[in-house]
Curated annotation (Swiss-Prot):
Pfam families linked to this entry: DALR_2, tRNA-synt_1e
Source organism (scientific name): Synechococcus sp. (strain CC9605)
Record-linked InterPro entries: Cys-tRNA-ligase (IPR015803), Cys-tRNA-synt_Ia_DALR (IPR015273), Cys-tRNA/MSH_ligase (IPR024909), Rossmann-like_a/b/a_fold (IPR014729), tRNA-synt_1_cat_dom (IPR032678), tRNAsynth_Ia_anticodon-bd (IPR009080)
Top class in the EC scheme: ligase
Catalysed reactions listed for this entry: tRNA(Cys) + L-cysteine + ATP = L-cysteinyl-tRNA(Cys) + AMP + diphosphate
SMART domains in the cross-refs: DALR_2
The protein's Enzyme Commission number: 6.1.1.16
Similarity comment: Belongs to the class-I aminoacyl-tRNA synthetase family.
GO cellular component: cytosol
One GO biological process term: cysteinyl-tRNA aminoacylation
Annotated motif 'KMSKS' region, positions: 270-274
Subunit structure, interactors included: Monomer.
Name of this chain's protein: Cysteine--tRNA ligase
Cofactor(s) needed by this chain: Zn(2+)
Length: 493
């Protein structure tokens, strides 16, 4: 089976055929940094982290861009509430986001542009739309005229003839009266007293929400990309409007493939800050829920399906992770006494190199994993393979933990070692890492050496080795926090 994903644009599962063979350009809509992130954000970024890891593992050269929306009404409102600047609110929440993502073992994007760093590109894009008659000024604002877009509504299925007020999303007071059509949306908002603003051909002001992503996609990846990612709540209006303005300006397709994750529900209702039914990532992790339990909880469901958040479901994930972790940490805890190699996990295909492993069942298990993940990123199917691999390893781990003699025939031990190697190899593809009991902590110099080695592994796109180094540090009570620009900070957990 070829690698296939469900395209939100066509509602069909399609073979992945990138613009350039062997490469994948991906843009993921990032957070609006006005508050801490909740479990819904965790779900989205865990899913897309696995997509990225899997594509890399399958041999693709992936360029992954994720933005920060750091100018928005929500940020301005929070700044006014707290009596601080918009920048202070943004910086605080960007830092918190990066810490949360690091704890969840989510790889940092290759680049993380900010809307405020793309003002020139935004203004250029608006000018191009204006020159094509697709933008108009109204009382200090500039709006996109949806009648100039081809097939507006093709992503969401919305009909522009539906005269729904506020349809463009994030509308300001009185904005509807300044628009020609309810679906028209702001490209540039005229300056208001006390708000940050930038000079422009239309007077001082700031960008609208949708134009920011269109400009950052073009700035970072060009006019057409392979995959555009986001939550299902962004299909309309945000992604619909991105398509309209980008394709009108550029005259070409914005993204070949659109992928959207399902929502996290609480009591049958979408988790959201506006409804007040959310739980932050930080609160969950600080309450004692392990990061890998949270990852497992998310990956047990297909990324497109709704995910019900209940105490029972989280407890079940914790139980599942306890067993999986026992198997994953077996080599680290007892590998030396068993004579096992604790080198980095093998690359894809290495399990059947040179005629294949002694146990052909491992080849079949790896192929089951690939078949599941190739089928629209079926992470629950991938996890099933991990649990199958883990069963005999858990039994051995339990015997060793009880101090029982683990004397086994050499061939059987060798087979279990191969099973463990494949388990941690595939677990790394899903971003799952063992959480061993903390050993005596390293000194600062040793930590710095390990971080340098991990940085070199990441530069070589050897993420399995990078994860192995992170795991070893975590086992010794050192937590790494990756930040944009290749910077890694650490704390003693």
């Amino acid at each position: 089976m070829s690698l296939r994903f469900t395209n939100s644009l066509t509602s069909r599962t399609e073979a992945f055929e990138p613009l350039t063979e062997g490469k994948a350009s991906i843009y993921c809509c990032g957070v609006t940094v006005y508050d801490l992130c909740h479990l819904g954000h965790a779900r989205s970024y865990i899913n897309w982290d696995v997509l990225r890891r899997y594509l890399i593992w399958r041999g693709y050269d992936v360029t992954y861009i994720q933005n920060y929306t750091d100018i928005d009404d929500k940020i301005l409102n929070r700044a006014n509430e707290e009596g601080i600047t918009m920048q202070a609110v943004s910086e605080r929440n960007i830092e918190a986001f990066e810490v949360d993502m690091g704890r969840l073992n989510i790889l940092p994007a290759d680049r993380m542009p900010r809307a405020t760093g793309c003002i020139e590109g935004i203004q250029t894009l608006i000018s191009e739309l204006e020159s094509k008659g697709a933008a108009y000024s109204s009382d200090g604002d500039v709006y996109f005229d949806i009648s100039k877009a081809k097939n507006y509504g093709k992503l969401s299925g919305r009909d522009p003839d539906d005269q729904q007020q506020g349809a463009s999303g994030r509308t300001a007071d009185g904005e509807e009266s300044r628009k020609r059509h309810p679906f028209d949306f702001a490209l540039w908002k005229g300056a208001k007293a006390g708000e940050p603003s930038w000079e422009s051909p239309w007077g001082p002001g700031r960008p609208g929400w949708h134009i920011e992503c269109s400009a950052m996609v073009r700035q970072e990846l060009g006019q057409t990309i392979d995959i555009h990612l986001g939550g299902g709540d962004l299909v309309f209006p945000h992604h619909e409007n991105e398509i309209a303005q980008s394709e009108t300006a550029n005259g070409t397709t914005l993204a070949k493939l659109w992928m959207h994750n399902g929502m996290v529900n609480v009591g049958g209702t979408k988790m959201s800050k506006s409804l007040g039914n959310f739980t932050t990532i930080r609160a969950l992790l600080d309450s004692g829920i392990s990061p890998m339990t949270l990852r497992l909880f998310v990956l047990q469901a297909h990324y497109r399906k709704p995910l019900d958040f209940t105490a029972e479901a989280l407890e079940a994930a914790a139980t599942g992770w306890k067993g999986l972790n026992a198997a994953l940490s077996l080599g680290g805890r007892h590998g030396e006494s068993l004579g096992w190699s604790t080198a980095a996990p093998l690359a894809e295909g290495a399990m059947n190199a040179d005629g294949g492993p002694a146990d052909t069942a491992l080849v079949e298990l790896e192929q089951r994993f690939i078949s599941a993940m190739d089928d629209d990123l079926n992470s629950s199917g991938g996890l099933a393979v991990l649990f199958d691999l883990a069963k005999p390893l858990r039994s051995l781990a339990n015997r060793l933990e009880r101090g029982e003699d683990a004397a086994l025939p050499e061939l059987e031990l060798k087979g279990l070692e191969g099973r463990w190697q494949l388990l941690r190899h595939l677990a790394a593809v899903l971003g799952l890492r063992s959480e061993a009991e903390a050993a005596p902590s390293l000194d600062d110099g040793a930590i710095d050496v390990a971080i340098a080695a991990r940085k070199a592994a990441k530069a070589a796109k050897d993420f399995a080795e990078a994860d192995r180094i992170r795991d070893e540090l975590a086992a010794q009570g050192v937590e790494l926090i990756d930040k944009p620009g290749g910077v890694t900070e650490w704390i003693r957990a």
